[in-house]
A protein has these predicted regions:
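C-terminal luminal/periplasmic domains and tails of membrane-associated envelope-modifying transferases
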Residues: 279-309, 314, 323-443
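Membrane-interface transmembrane helices that cradle and orient dolichyl/undecaprenyl
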Residues: 9-11, 47-66, 76, 183-185, ...
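Transmembrane-helix signature of polytopic, membrane-embedded enzymes
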Residues: 1-25, 44, 189
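Transmembrane alpha-helices and membrane-interface helical segments
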Residues: 2, 44-56, 87-99, 172-180, ...
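Membrane-interface alpha helices of multi-pass inner-membrane proteins
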Residues: 19-21, 65-81, 91-92, 198-202
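Transmembrane alpha-helical segments
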Residues: 26, 83, 246-288
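Short acidic/glycine- and proline-prone juxtamembrane loop motifs at membrane-interface regions
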Residues: 28-41, 211-212
Length: 443
């Protein structure tokens, strides 16, 4: 609605449905929402911040507006850690734009005074209330912890956005940006939105890569550009047939892009033109095979016992089985989350505490999974403490079940320290120290 008020008159009967379609048919917006992640919810607060700041220049101190900005900022920080990168970049660019405008209007003194009266107390309250959060963020080496997820810097992440959003989506966003920059009434907002998203992306990609849900820190920019394009395509001064045709073509693209992301068998294509996001809603064909595994767990374990399933490939993981049977929610605690990433998961003591451990023959698999498979599938100081029970053929892979027969001894502990020596050199607190703490606890 704000854009409608700033841009040449448009046909709102077409404009508003198109804007709604841009959001609800956007695969990147739907991916975290369909996976129970709060990232999409955070966009509500980002939108409030952007909207309230769009035409506010700190010429006065309208406290209802300022309180709303403060509340939205506070809530957005709580939503997801990576939204802080967008907050930092947005406010830096916004403040710079406001001060430049104040210099041009010769009101720098009063503008700066009002800005400090609001920003200083707000910063003190937010930092004070969220001190543990900020302390953790400032003292944590995320580049080290998330090193296993890091897929390269800014350039690689730009290419990643090409795959995630698709070429057509990015071209449409670029067209919307050109239109908003062309219109003087929206030029400043377009520059702030573009610079804020660019800054957020540069800051974030120094330590992490933009995954499916982290990419939503760019959503304010993408959506503003697409909304601007919708306003351009539905201008009232355009010929009705041309306006309707343009809106129809955009709507068809949005539907096709969304439909392709559903990954329906035989009805999707892999192309850079469309989003690579997968909203796969098809039913698995291996549920009977998976049921054999979960039935074994339910039959041979009590609810206070656990089973460790050591796999993270071929569409399987421990959590795949844990959540595969809604009729038995106790599986969610009986089947342990698999440890696969060295920098975040560390040594899986679950292989020692669980009644059964299930592994595969993928002994060369990277991270933690492969070495644990090897420890049980070959002769090792660990294998002597397990006995083979049964096996479960799955889709393209076999799961071998072993029962733990004895507590770990010093020889087994030293064996795993040697196996994970490379990881232990970087993260001793979650490898050798964790092993030592466990061994002390069972003595």
């Amino acid at each position: 609605k704000y854009l409608v008020q700033q841009l040449p008159a448009c046909h709102t009967v077409l404009y508003y449905p198109l804007c709604m379609a841009v959001m609800v048919l956007w695969p990147m917006f739907l991916w975290p929402a369909t996976h129970g992640m709060p990232d999409a919810f955070g966009l509500t607060f980002a939108a409030v911040i952007a909207l309230l700041c769009a035409d506010y220049r700190f010429e006065t101190l309208p406290w209802p507006r300022l309180l709303a900005i403060f509340a939205a900022t506070f809530a957005l920080i709580l939503t997801r850690r990576w939204y802080m990168f967008w907050i930092l970049a947005f406010y830096a660019v916004y403040v710079l734009a406001v001060l430049v405008g104040a210099v041009r209007r010769k009101t720098l003194g009063s503008t700066l005074k009002h800005m400090l009266l609001f920003s200083v107390p707000s910063a003190v309250i937010i930092v004070g209330a969220l001190l543990p959060t900020f302390k953790t963020i400032l003292t944590t080496d995320y580049a080290d912890i998330y090193g296993a997820y890091y897929g390269g810097g800014f350039g690689n992440n730009c290419l990643g956005q090409l795959r995630t959003q698709g070429l057509i989506w990015l071209v449409l966003c670029a067209a919307g940006l050109v239109w908003l920059l062309y219109c003087r009434s929206t030029r400043a907002q377009a520059i702030v939105a573009a610079a804020a998203s660019l800054g957020a992306m540069v800051l974030f990609t120094r330590t992490q890569s933009l995954g499916d849900h982290q990419s939503l820190i760019l959503a304010p920019f993408y959506l503003l550009m697409l909304f601007g394009l919708c306003a351009k395509l539905t201008q009232q001064k355009a010929k009705p047939w041309l306006r309707n045709a343009a809106a129809g073509v955009l709507a068809v693209f949005l539907v096709v892009n969304f439909g392709n992301a559903l990954r329906l068998p035989g009805k999707n294509v892999q192309t850079l033109a469309l989003s690579s996001e997968s909203l796969d809603l098809t039913r698995r064909t291996d549920l009977a095979q998976m049921r054999a595994v979960t039935d074994f767990v339910l039959e041979h374990c009590t609810e206070d016992q656990t089973v460790y399933i050591n796999m993270d490939s071929n569409g399987y993981s421990g959590t795949t089985f844990a959540y595969s049977d809604p009729a038995h929610p106790q599986l969610q605690t009986m089947i342990l989350w698999e440890s696969s990433v060295p920098s975040t998961h560390g040594f899986p003591t679950g292989i020692w505490t669980s009644e059964y451990v299930m592994v595969t023959d993928r002994v060369d698999e990277g991270g933690i999974v492969g070495p644990i498979n090897a420890a049980l599938r070959i002769q090792s100081p660990a294998a002597v403490h397990y006995e083979y029970v049964t096996e479960f053929p799955l889709d393209g892979i076999t799961l071998y079940c072993y029962r733990r027969t004895a507590r770990p001894d010093a020889e087994e502990a030293d064996y795993f320290k040697q196996v994970f020596a490379e990881y232990d050199a970087r993260w001793p607190e979650i490898f050798s120290q964790r092993i030592d703490e466990y061994m002390q606890s069972v003595q």
